[in-house]
From Swiss-Prot:
Keyword Repeat appears in the UniProt entry: no
PROSITE patterns linked: RRM (PS50102)
Identification of the protein by name: RNA-binding motif protein, X chromosome retrogene-like
This protein's UniProt keywords: Acetylation, Developmental protein, Isopeptide bond, Methylation, mRNA processing, mRNA splicing, Nucleus, Phosphoprotein, Ribonucleoprotein, RNA-binding, Spliceosome, Transcription, Ubl conjugation
Bias-annotated ranges (Basic and acidic residues): 61-80, 191-212, 238-271, 335-344, 377-388
Source species: Rattus norvegicus
Function according to Swiss-Prot or TrEMBL: RNA-binding protein that plays several role in the regulation of pre- and post-transcriptional processes. Implicated in tissue-specific regulation of gene transcription and alternative splicing of pre-mRNAs. Associates with chromatin. Associates with nascent mRNAs transcribed by RNA polymerase II. Component of the supraspliceosome complex that regulates pre-mRNA alternative splice site selection. Binds non-specifically to pre-mRNAs.
UniProt record, GO biological process: cellular response to interleukin-1; membrane protein ectodomain proteolysis; mRNA splice site recognition; negative regulation of mRNA splicing, via spliceosome; positive regulation of mRNA splicing, via spliceosome; positive regulation of transcription by RNA polymerase II; protein homooligomerization; regulation of alternative mRNA splicing, via spliceosome
Gene of this entry: Rbmxrtl
């Protein structure tokens, strides 16, 4: 755009609309021989648009005119005289703006892309609701929990608690607690489900549909665990174990947010209510946790063996993750947890505590989703406990 037009061609701007070609020729003709005078006029009114192109035969003359006449007054108006740029002034003038325009769109695009990028990342959190945040937290903290995890393994329930507490707190701040309290109140089952549904619907609605289990498991524990799974894989792990033991826990899990929170603090409380069971769940959860740690990725959550699977799978797959993780985690976690436990030689009590949740939970998750979760899971749970 800045490229100069042919030598000797000048752009004359800021002209009085009354100034015509003759006046221009009279003024500029004294500097040298003029080859062409092109006064730009409005097509409709044929009035001067206030600028013209004057082409001198000699480029030197044009330079002199540009130097002497630029800023001078012509017919009462200060005119601008400069080397004409390609293409003609009109397009030329438009030309310069176009670059900005072209640039502008890119900027817009960039901004948009940036925005899109930002939102996506944000979207993750938002989409998940508190979960993704939890996940992030859990994931970010996950490693810490894992690190903590080992002690928890040896420590047992307390460490677990602490571990969850970290993530939990963060998530609990988010509403894990509220979900929990709600979970307890509503933990009656359907009520809980309703509360969950609102949130769950938000995140899970798609998943809920996908998981008839969700509805059923809103029935509770395992199903809930699934919910949790959907939202918060980590919570699921805890939730599975924890709530498999304690119904209150289940409530939280069903919440999914509460999972972490629930399993962290809320769960602890619920656990306390359940008492031994909660501990067992913790232990089992710890065991599972330790087992997963052996695995590796799971460490972050430990019990999260499942959770890890989910989280990893989840991160990778998103929705499919849920289904896959649910089926797989159920089978795999149950089998694996046991194996891990046995390998570790965890105390039978732990083993015991852990399996029940697993069995009951796995069975409930499998059966409950179809069967109607609530009753099934409950019976499973009860049976599992008594059984083990």
């Amino acid at each position: 755009m800045v490229e100069a037009d042919r030598p000797g061609k000048l752009f004359i701007g800021g002209l009085n609309t009354e100034t015509n070609e003759k006046a221009l020729e009279a003024v500029f003709g004294k500097y040298g021989r003029i080859v062409e005078i092109l006064l730009m006029k409005d097509r409709e009114t044929n009035k001067s648009r206030g600028f013209a192109f004057v082409t001198f035969e000699s480029p030197a003359d044009a330079k002199d005119v540009a130097r002497d006449m630029n800023g001078k007054s012509l017919d009462g108006k200060a005119i601008k005289v400069e080397q004409a740029t390609k293409p003609s002034f009109e397009s030329g003038r438009r030309g310069p703006p176009p670059p900005p325009r072209s640039r502008g769109p890119p900027r817009g695009l960039r901004g948009g892309s940036g925005g899109t990028r930002g939102p996506p990342s944000r979207g993750g959190y938002m989409d998940d609701g508190g979960y993704s945040m939890n996940f992030n937290m859990s994931s970010s903290r996950g490693p810490l929990p894992v690190k903590r995890g080992p002690p928890p393994r040896s420590g047992g329930p307390p460490p677990k608690r602490s571990t969850p507490s970290g993530p939990v707190r963060s998530s609990s701040g988010m509403g894990g607690r509220t979900p929990v309290s709600r979970g307890r109140d509503s933990y009656g089952g359907p009520p809980r489900r309703e509360p969950l549904p609102s949130r769950r619907d938000v995140y899970l609605s798609p998943r809920d549909d996908g998981y008839s289990t969700k509805d059923s498991y809103s029935s509770r524990d395992y199903p809930s665990s699934r919910d949790t799974r959907d939202y918060a894989p980590p919570p699921r792990d805890y939730t599975y174990r924890d709530y498999s033991h304690s119904s209150s826990r289940d409530d939280y899990p069903s919440r999914g947010y509460g999972d972490r929170d629930g399993y962290g603090r809320d769960r602890e409380y619920s656990d306390h209510p359940s008492g031994g069971s909660y501990r067992d769940s913790y232990e089992s959860y710890g065991n599972s946790r330790s087992a997963p740690p052996t695995r590796g990725p799971p460490p972050s959550y430990g019990g999260s063996s499942r959770y890890d699977d989910y989280s990893s799978s989840r991160d990778g797959y998103g929705g499919s993750r849920d289904s896959y993780s649910s089926s797989r985690s159920d089978l795999y976690s149950s089998g694996r947890d046991r194996v891990g436990r046995q390998e570790r030689g965890l105390p039978p009590s732990m083993e015991r505590g852990y399996p029940p949740p697993r069995d009951s939970y796995s069975s409930s998750s499998r059966g409950a989703p179809r069967g109607g979760g609530r009753g099934g899971s409950r019976s499973d749970r009860g049976g599992g406990r008594s059984r083990y």
